Amino acid sequence: MFYAIKNNYDQAVMIHGDDQYHVKYVPKLFKSLENKKFSAVTGSRMKIKKNALIGKMPIYKFIGNIFLTFMFNLVFKTDFTDCHTGLWAYRVKKLKEINFGQIDNGYNFDSQLRINFINKKLKIKEIPIQTFYRDEHSSYHIKYSINFLKELFTYR
């Protein structure tokens, strides 16, 4: 993303490195950016809820995603279906409007960037995608969830 900004690309994509997101969706993301009213496009695992379950999203993550996205929508008066996706495409011109010095370069980067987009009235579109989950044994989801809820009120 920062390489795209530095080199004045038109569009950039961000894909989490956890092998959950297939690159086959990237052309659809970029195609959606052709509509100039959108500054970013995300792949939503929850737009068609069964897609998340077909991709073997653990039930606790499924329920957690619904709850945390509900809270986000409540606070910011938005109607997203998946605030925790790891698949984004951006219009680089709009990324240049963001002060990245105020955004944490960790697990909460995506949600802080989403909040920045909303606060700047930049439009985000969601397209439905499927993902694939592998067996995982991480306790970070609890810490992430707590930090996410804190951010809703900190960056509002």
Regions found by a protein language model. Give the residues of each.
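C-terminal, non-catalytic tails of nucleotide-sugar-dependent glycosyltransferases
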Residues: 151-156
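DNA-recognition element of transcription regulators
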Residues: 111
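Acidic metal-phosphate-binding loop of nucleotide-sugar-dependent transferases
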Residues: 19-20
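Acceptor/aglycone-binding surface of glycosyltransferases and processive sugar-polymer synthases
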Residues: 1-6, 11, 23-103, 134-142, ...
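Catalytic donor-sugar/metal-binding loop of nucleotide-sugar-dependent glycosyltransferases
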Residues: 78-79, 101-105, 114-130
